[in-house]
A protein has these predicted regions:
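N-terminal accessory regions of S-adenosyl-L-methionine
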Residues: 1-166
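Conserved alpha-helix/loop element of class I SAM-dependent methyltransferases that forms part
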Residues: 163-184
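Conserved SAM-binding loop of SAM-dependent methyltransferases across substrates and taxa
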Residues: 175, 195-205
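Conserved class I S-adenosyl-L-methionine
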Residues: 183-194
Length: 206
């Protein structure tokens, strides 16, 4: 399975830097130098430099896993506490597991909003104009350090055009299924369980 995922994400052996990786670890020092003062001094040149760095590696900026890293991350996810359903409501939070879902379900990164062809998050990353727009968003809407690291860039790509496929939070799926079926080893039918975070959350429930 892991080889198929790597093929889908275009991950090569030289992109792997630890059990959890973005593939951009070797260029973090370069990205650190392209900070907010650098952008304020010369916005266009800074955006172009960041763009060139990302194109030099050219993989979608999400968190990836080795097989061992994936197993460890799923175990950690399963042992993490979460907000259960109370009075037919789930409290805010329950964000754990989202990086796992992005990696395990590439369809979440390639799904397109209805009527907007070539507008998936993956398409936006490989579109030069949209990638540069996302880089600019990183500088214009955030302060601090690591402004153009992969996580920040992914979030900015989600803002480009403003239309995104939303994943179901795995921990919310886990909370719902255990609320609906509190019996250990019970069965719940979910017609969309295979699409994204619902499958991860349900498979880690009781």
């Amino acid at each position: 399975m892991i080889k198929d995922l790597y093929k889908t994400w275009n991950i090569q052996s030289h992109n792997i830097h630890g059990e959890e990786f973005t593939g951009y670890e070797p260029v973090y020092d370069q990205l650190d130098q392209l900070d907010k003062p650098a952008f304020n001094k010369d916005p266009e040149a800074t955006v172009n430099k960041v763009f060139d760095i990302y194109r030099s590696i050219n993989i979608v900026p999400i968190l990836y896993f080795t097989e061992k890293g994936l197993i460890n991350a799923i175990k950690e996810f399963k042992s993490t506490s979460y907000n259960a359903v109370k009075n037919s409501k789930i409290s805010l939070g329950n964000n754990r597991g989202q990086p796992l879902s992005r990696f395990l379900f590439p369809n979440m990164m390639t799904a397109e909003p209805k009527g907007r062809g070539s507008n998936s998050l993956k398409d936006r990353f490989y579109n030069d104009t949209k990638l540069k727009r996302a880089i600019r968003i990183c500088y214009e809407m955030r302060e601090g350090h690591k402004l153009v690291y992969p996580t920040a860039l992914r979030r900015a790509l989600e803002l480009v055009t403003g239309e995104n496929i939303q994943n179901f939070k795995p921990q919310n799926a886990r909370a719902l299924v255990e609320h609906l079926c509190p019996v250990l080893w019970g069965n719940v039918y979910d017609y969309s369980a295979g699409y994204g975070g619902r499958l991860l959350g349900i498979s880690c429930s009781n």
